[in-house]
């Protein structure tokens, strides 16, 4: 599964990339961007399974980026990282279907659990797709 990271702080991007590289299995670090505009371009070109994004960034914030991708019909799971515990951010993220909302600093354990949760969701959705196609054919 392909993951991209959209984060304005280079040290955080590098740290996340290193964590993904450490993980064994089907996770592949597929790219990174430093703001929402560049992140949206990356989403369009790579079509990742998962986007890990900050909220507040220059040019376009993470939630705007995810909303723009969804409006274009790009279905992607998202992990939102935020230094802000304001409820409004979390509520907006939940309304958009964000899979995980993690507060910085994120522990390694939290990060791995979030990705495992997403992996499980993706697998369940893939198993349900043939069932849905079969019911449409009847």
Predicted segment positions?
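Receiver (REC) domain active-site loop signature in two-component systems and cognate sites
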Residues: 57
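Active-site residues of response regulator receiver
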Residues: 7, 54
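Two-component signal transduction core modules
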Residues: 51, 78, 93, 101-102
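Two-component/phosphorelay signaling modules centered on CheY-like receiver
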Residues: 10-31, 45
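Interdomain helical linkers/hinges and coiled-coil/dimerization scaffolds
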Residues: 94, 98-100, 106-138
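Alpha4 helix (beta4-alpha4-beta5 surface) of REC/receiver domains from two-component response regulators
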Residues: 64, 85-100
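Helix N-cap/capping motif at the beta->alpha junctions
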Residues: 32-41, 62-65
């Amino acid at each position: 599964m392909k993951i991209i990271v959209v984060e304005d702080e280079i040290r955080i991007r590098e740290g996340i990339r290193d964590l993904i590289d450490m993980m064994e299995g089907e996770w592949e670090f597929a790219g990174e961007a430093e703001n929402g505009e560049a992140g949206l371009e990356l989403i369009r070109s790579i079509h990742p399974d998962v986007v890990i994004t900050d909220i507040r960034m220059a040019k376009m914030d993470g939630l705007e980026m995810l909303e723009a991708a969804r409006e274009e019909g790009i279905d992607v799971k998202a992990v939102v990282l935020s230094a802000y515990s304001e409820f409004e951010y979390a509520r907006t993220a939940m309304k958009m279907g964000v899979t995980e909302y993690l507060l910085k600093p994120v522990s390694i354990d939290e990060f791995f659990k979030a990705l495992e949760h997403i992996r499980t969701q993706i697998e369940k959705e893939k198993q349900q797709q043939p069932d849905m196609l079969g019911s449409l054919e009847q």
